[in-house]
Amino acid sequence: MSWTPARRSVSLKIAFAIGVAFTTLDHAAFAQSCCAGTGAVTPGRLALHEFALVGVQAKTAVDLGSFDRGGHYVANPSGASELDLEQDFFAAIRIFKRGQLALLIPLVETRRTASGVADEFGGGLGDINASARYDFTLAGASQFVPGIAALAGFTFPSGRPADSPNLGPLATGATGIGAYQINVGLAVEQTFGPWLVNATVLYAQRTARTVGDAPNTVHERLAAQWTFLSSLAYTFPSEVALAVSGSYTIEGDALINGVDNVGTAHRLPTLTFSGVYPLSDSWRLQGAIYDNLQITPLGLNQPAGAGLLLTIVRSWT
């Protein structure tokens, strides 16, 4: 198949809109010390005409407050603040024409302040994610049948969990959740002229882990996590594209020593505005801003904030 400018535009639009949307999901979830990111896709989703890509993404986010166990939003107290930084290095390659494999390696840094405590900065390697995607049908190929894709991912606990030693008084050295995570998902998307509409559902399950030293050990298992995402994107004739995405992540109560730990469930909404600017046939810039919508009672047991992302991608056809 030869790739005309119109086909290439649709292809880039689909890859960009969903890739950037999931990037903000990953970051928002990673900021939760108790919860893992969705991890089902990377910010480097391949366009249909692309064979491989590599990229680097920089993230900056600030915590503005948190949702308590009753779902009420509370701003940070005086003297308390948090700045989260992350640099993601990722690559993706196409297999079987409609499939793709990807790898993401994150570096994570955190700066925290608290009243009566000196400022603290720490970080390191985060949890590495490998992912896969297979498109059974393609968006825009049929007027009646949308694009349908299966998503899968596996996250390795390469980061340091919050219970690790020598993390600092404010635990800024924590960079992971300390558990393996398996993700599966389903994406449905369709194009309508220059518009793209997407709906995705993701399911994540984490392995159990033992925390502490005998005889004071605690057996912990995080509950399953569900994420629901919808996106709307528009591509201009220049192939510049803009998108708006909304997501909602839900997680049940954790199990502690086999007993349901009531009051530990989580909820977090995220609203994202993103864009892509093609620099050439092989290079593109992607950017996004997101906010966790500090509205009672949308969240639960979660820090809430806002962030900025900037990504550069090099692809091959």
Regions found by a protein language model. Name each.
Residues 79-131:
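Long, hydrophobic/aromatic-enriched structural stretches that serve as scaffold segments
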Residues 109-221:
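Outer-membrane pore/translocation modules
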